[in-house]
Amino acid sequence: MIYIMRHGTTPYNKEGRLQGQMDIPLSEEGINQAKEAALRLKDIHFDEIYSSDLMRAHKTAEIIARFHDTGGVINDRRLREIGLGTWEGKTYDYLRKNEPDYALFYNSPQLYKGDVPEKYIDVLKRLNDFFNELDHEKDILVVSHGFVIYHLLKDIHNYEPIVPIDNCEVIKYDYKNNTFERNFMR
């Protein structure tokens, strides 16, 4: 079983800012969310815990790892959020009003050909490579980012999340049966 988790809340999440690959820390709320998630996950055995190397995901994974004897968190750059260059740090309101290409990127990133440091197809390739390397006989927690998780589910595994993935939400993925379960911890 693979458990896919979005990092806890950051100050930029609260301000409605695009983070991308900016290394933004968790807020107090995000730390508390991670602690609450750790308690909800404490009875699930994880053989391994992987995380994006960005601090907001890594700190979330570290908090979870305190309840699990896995030997620590394994950072993997392939789990990073998409790099969006000059859009990073700007509010979503600003982007919608002042960056006409942002709407195309947001709604159809696979069609966007603009100037960003990382193309959508490259994100999918690195995610696909990561998941193909996992030992699918193990129970694994993966902590990553909203855009990455959404498109991992949608475009690699053909599962369309109906609503955005919340901070510290965990999605359970049964690799053998290719099924997903949201809100299984609530």
Stretch-by-stretch model annotation:
Residues I63, H151, D155:
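Active-site signature of alpha/beta-hydrolase-fold catalytic machinery across serine-
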Residues P25, F67-R126:
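Phosphate-handling substructures
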Residues M1-Y3, E48:
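Extreme N-terminal starter segment of soluble prokaryotic enzymes
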Residues Y159-E181:
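Domain-level recognition of soluble alpha/beta enzyme cores
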Residues F46-D53, I74, D139-V143:
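Short glycine-rich phosphate-binding loop at a beta-alpha junction
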Residues P11, R56-H58, E81-I82, V148-Y150:
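Short, active-site-adjacent cap segments at secondary-structure transitions
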Residues T9-H68:
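Active-site-proximal alpha-helix that buttresses catalytic centers in soluble enzyme cores
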Residues I2, H136-V148:
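Generic beta-sheet signal
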